[in-house]
């Protein structure tokens, strides 16, 4: 069985992070390591006392998404890795399902929730269906930021920004993996709960 690290990344999500951490700790297939990073906000200082089994990087200064993700990626020593926004959470059998798949990168479907989910539906409605009051977002032939991938392959590519309005570091990584012939598999199950909430749109 391969080893897995889950990197939980927070920026102004300290009020939601415990929910995310709990969803990783309760996985039916436990991760071998959990790394948590607060990118210079300072709202996650309460977490180490509650969840001492998690390894923390609590930055004093903000590095920005791309540099932060790249730094955390290079800290990973397990066979596989997943990045997870601290405002989101996983279904309890996610790692068990994904770890059984022989691939360089595994993408799976998303359940979009939260009081701002409609905005995402307005842009990607052709990929979404109603699901238990939320939205089911198929990622067939696509990517997302919480895909599970082989660490050494990802580290050889690295997270890079596009320089545009959105950094798209995860899309850039996914495309380069495909360019290098990576084997990609898709799981037709909504394993990631993607929370669209007001903090997503607050500018500081």
Question: Language model features by range: what are they?
Answer:
Residues 1-23:
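N-proximal low-complexity "stem/linker" segments adjacent to membrane-targeting elements
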Residues 22-31:
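Short, acidic, metal-binding catalytic loop of nucleotide-sugar glycosyltransferases
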Residues 37-46, 61, 85:
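A conserved acidic beta->alpha catalytic loop
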Residues 59-76:
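Glycine-rich, basic loop-to-helix element that forms the pyrophosphate-binding segment
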Residues 81:
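Short aromatic/hydrophobic "clamp" motif used to bind/position activated sugar donors
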Residues 93-121:
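Conserved donor NDP-sugar-binding/catalytic core segment of glycosyltransferases
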Residues 129-148:
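A recurrent flexible, glycine/aromatic-enriched loop bordering the glycosyltransferase active site
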Residues 165-173:
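Acidic donor-binding loop at a coil-to-helix junction in glycosyltransferase catalytic cores
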């Amino acid at each position: 069985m391969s080893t897995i690290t889950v990197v939980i990344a927070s920026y102004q999500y300290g009020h939601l992070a415990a929910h995310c951490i709990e969803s990783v700790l309760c996985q039916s297939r436990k991760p071998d390591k959990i790394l948590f990073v607060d990118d210079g906000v300072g709202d996650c200082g309460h977490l180490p006392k509650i969840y001492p089994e998690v390894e923390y990087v609590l930055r004093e200064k903000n590095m920005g998404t791309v540099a932060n993700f790249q730094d955390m990626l290079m800290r990973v020593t397990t066979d596989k890795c997943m990045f997870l926004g601290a405002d989101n959470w996983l279904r309890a059998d996610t790692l068990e399902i994904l770890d059984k798949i022989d691939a360089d990168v595994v993408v799976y479907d998303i359940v979009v929730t939260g009081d701002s989910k409609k905005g995402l539906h307005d842009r990607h409605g052709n990929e979404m269906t109603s699901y238990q009051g939320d939205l089911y977002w198929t990622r067939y032939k696509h990517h997302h930021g919480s895909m599970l991938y082989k660490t050494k392959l990802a580290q050889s590519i690295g997270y890079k920004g596009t320089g545009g309005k959105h950094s798209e570091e995860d899309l850039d990584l996914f495309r380069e993996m495909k360019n290098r012939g990576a084997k990609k598999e898709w799981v037709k199950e909504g394993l990631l709960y993607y929370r669209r909430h007001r903090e997503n749109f607050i500018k500081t």
